[in-house]
């Protein structure tokens, strides 16, 4: 998420950010990158109208808002529900979704994974995909096939960058001030 935010800032866009859940650490990273407050949008605690109000309030005066999801796209409460999931948040806020998919060491299997997301539930709101962990050499052909076969936009890739990995402590939580 921080890489996407930085890429948008580098393109001189005014950016807002939010996190799907009550986590306070991710919004601290967002704020550090974009130089503005990031908010939380939690479909467990807030109803649809409140979520839309908070999103509009946070996005005021910005060109784009990036909402970081939680866990897997459809993962909600109790392992068998989409309640409080990123999917539910996208539904309630009518937000387009760019899915980030692990593409490290894979080729056409990435398309099978994306197809599964597209077919799993109706109105998934997925309009684009970012391939995580692939190289420039594998991205170009995968992007073409992704768009041709699945009709979903390939929005870019994030290569494996070991020097950019964050060290973890406790439960893997490191605050922005510690980086």
What residues fall within each predicted segment?
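Internal gly/pro-rich beta-alpha loop/helix module
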Residues: 108-179
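ATP-dependent carboxylate-amine ligase catalytic core
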Residues: 5-93, 101-125, 136-141
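Conserved beta-strand segments of the P-loop GTPase G domain that flank and frequently precede/overlap
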Residues: 99-102, 130-132
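Glycine-rich phosphate-binding P-loop
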Residues: 1-2
């Amino acid at each position: 998420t921080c890489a996407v935010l930085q890429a948008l800032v580098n393109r001189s866009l005014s950016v807002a950010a939010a996190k799907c859940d009550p986590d306070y650490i991710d919004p601290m990273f967002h704020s550090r990158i974009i130089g503005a407050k990031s908010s939380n949008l939690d479909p467990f605690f807030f109803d649809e109208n409140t979520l839309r109000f908070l999103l509009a309030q946070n996005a005021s005066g910005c060109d784009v808002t990036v909402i970081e999801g939680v866990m897997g796209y459809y993962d909600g409460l109790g392992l068998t529900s989409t309640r409080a999931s990123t999917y539910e948040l996208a539904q309630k806020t009518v937000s387009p979704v760019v899915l980030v998919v692990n593409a490290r060491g894979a080729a056409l299997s990435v398309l099978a994974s994306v197809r599964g997301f597209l077919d799993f539930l109706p109105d998934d709101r997925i309009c684009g995909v970012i391939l995580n962990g692939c190289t420039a050499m594998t991205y170009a052909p995968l992007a073409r096939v992704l768009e041709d076969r699945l009709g979903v936009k390939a929005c870019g890739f994030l290569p494996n960058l070991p020097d950019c990995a964050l060290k973890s402590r406790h439960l893997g939580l490191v605050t922005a001030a510690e980086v």
